Structures are given as structure tokens and as C-alpha cells.
Amino acid sequence: MNKDDIIKEFQIHDTDTGSTAVQIALLTARIRHLTEHLKNHPKDFHSRRGLMKMVGRRRKMLKYLMKKDPELYKQLLEKLSLRK
């Protein structure tokens, strides 16, 4: 799935490209891609560190979204097949 498809699926209105939901969805796609890369290259520690930073950033955004809009938070977790 490319970036434009992800943005179209999670945007709130037509010109929305940077809302929290879109950012979380894009980060999730990058995290999944990098996870696959690390399965094939287990000693790539630089990429592993980048992955950890992305996971932390996504966690912070999810925490913010949970406070700001709990309903959207639940929908996003469902669509992205994340925890809880």
C-alpha cells in the first residue's frame, strides 16, 4: 500500500494529509515494512534503532489521540489491527 492510498483511507476531509490518524497510519505502514526488513537482516542495528524511534513516536500519538478523540482512537486501532 503506498502513501497516497493510506492518506485517502484515513483522512478526515479531502485536504487532510497531516491529522493524527493519518500520521499514525503512515507510521504503522513504515513500522510493518521495517519489521519485515529486520526479519531478513537481523544484524541491521541502525534500522532497528529507527524502528524503535518510530514505535515510540506512534505510541505518543496514540496516547494523544486517546485523550483527544476516544472514538476515533478505537476505530483506528480496529482498522490498523493494533492492540486492545
UniProtKB/Swiss-Prot annotation:
This is Small ribosomal subunit protein uS15. InterPro entries: Ribosomal_uS15, Ribosomal_uS15_bac-type, uS15_NS1_RNA-bd_sf. The keyword Ribonucleoprotein applies. One of the primary rRNA binding proteins, it binds directly to 16S rRNA where it helps nucleate assembly of the platform of the 30S subunit by binding and bridging several RNA helices of the 16S rRNA. Forms an intersubunit bridge (bridge B4) with the 23S rRNA of the 50S subunit in the ribosome. SUPFAM superfamilies: S15/NS1 RNA-binding domain (SSF47060). Belongs to the universal ribosomal protein uS15 family. One of its GO terms (cellular component) is cytosolic small ribosomal subunit. GO terms for biological process: translation. Gene3D superfamilies: 6.10.250.3130, S15/NS1, RNA-binding (1.10.287.10). HAMAP family: Ribosomal_uS15_B.
